């Protein structure tokens, strides 16, 4: 065998490979698929660029496992239907969050006294007054046991209290004052009887004789 035989055989192999991998042609933006051709991601149904039609159609690039191949519809994303569902999803999200908020157990929330209901069944706490407020109310009560509406408003603004608080304080103070004076009046007759007891004098002794 001559050397020309080996050269020709080697050259024939390269030519066969060249047909399998053709030289890429210069591509342009016009040869790329447009948006209508790329409607589905990974679908593989759109046309290929003009530069590589024979490359992907070669038997080397065929799926060696036809039993495990996926149809184009299995991974095809319909963008149009997804875009139509976006408003529906956005409308359902606030409702879902609101429903989840109402269904949360009360143990996750801390209830403060001011958050409780103010209905008739509510147990009212005892109103506390500062030392300054108590002193001013006592001074006013010393001069006036009953307040007019105008005076009550003035005191409420001066002490940063409500008219209802002023009214209740004076009612309680009058009850306390009456109770104290009633106790004093109950004790006073006993002392008066002792002081008004009859005493024997020298003239009475003479009359008895």
From Swiss-Prot:
InterPro entries: Antp_homeobox, HD, HD_metazoa, Homeobox_antennapedia, Homeobox_Antennapedia_CS, Homeobox_CS, Homeodomain-like_sf. One of its GO terms (cellular component) is nucleus. A motif (Antp-type hexapeptide) lies at residues 111-116. Keywords: Developmental protein, DNA-binding, Homeobox, Nucleus, Transcription, Transcription regulation. Pfam families: Homeodomain. One of its GO terms (biological process) is anterior/posterior pattern specification. Residues 25-44, 179-209 are annotated as: Disordered. The keyword DNA-binding applies. GO terms for molecular function: DNA-binding transcription factor activity, RNA polymerase II-specific; RNA polymerase II cis-regulatory region sequence-specific DNA binding. It is found in: Nucleus. Residues 122-181 bind DNA. Residues 26-38 have a biased composition (Polar residues). Induction: By derriere. Its main location: nucleus. Sequence-specific transcription factor which is part of a developmental regulatory system that provides cells with specific positional identities on the anterior-posterior axis. Belongs to the Antp homeobox family. This is Homeobox protein Hox-A7. The gene is hoxa7.
């Amino acid at each position: 065998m001559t050397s020309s035989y080996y050269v020709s055989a080697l050259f024939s192999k390269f030519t066969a490979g060249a047909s399998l991998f053709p030289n890429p042609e210069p591509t342009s933006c016009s040869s790329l698929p447009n948006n209508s051709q790329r409607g589905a991601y990974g679908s593989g149904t759109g046309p290929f660029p003009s530069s590589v039609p024979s490359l992907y159609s070669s038997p080397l690039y065929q799926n060696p496992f036809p039993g495990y191949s996926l149809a184009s519809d299995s991974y095809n994303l319909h963008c149009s239907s997804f875009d139509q569902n976006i408003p529906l999803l956005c409308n359902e999200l606030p409702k879902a969050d609101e429903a989840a908020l109402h269904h949360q157990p009360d143990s996750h929330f801390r209830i403060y006294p001011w958050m409780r209901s103010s209905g008739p069944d509510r147990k009212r706490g005892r109103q506390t007054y500062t030392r300054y407020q108590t002193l001013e109310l006592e001074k006013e009560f010393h001069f006036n046991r009953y307040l007019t509406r105008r005076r009550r408003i003035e005191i409420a603004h001066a002490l940063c209290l409500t008219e209802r608080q002023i009214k209740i304080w004076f009612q309680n103070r009058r009850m306390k004052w009456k109770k104290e004076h009633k106790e004093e009046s109950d004790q006073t007759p006993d002392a008066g009887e002792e002081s008004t007891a009859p005493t024997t004098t020298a003239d009475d002794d003479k009359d008895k004789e």
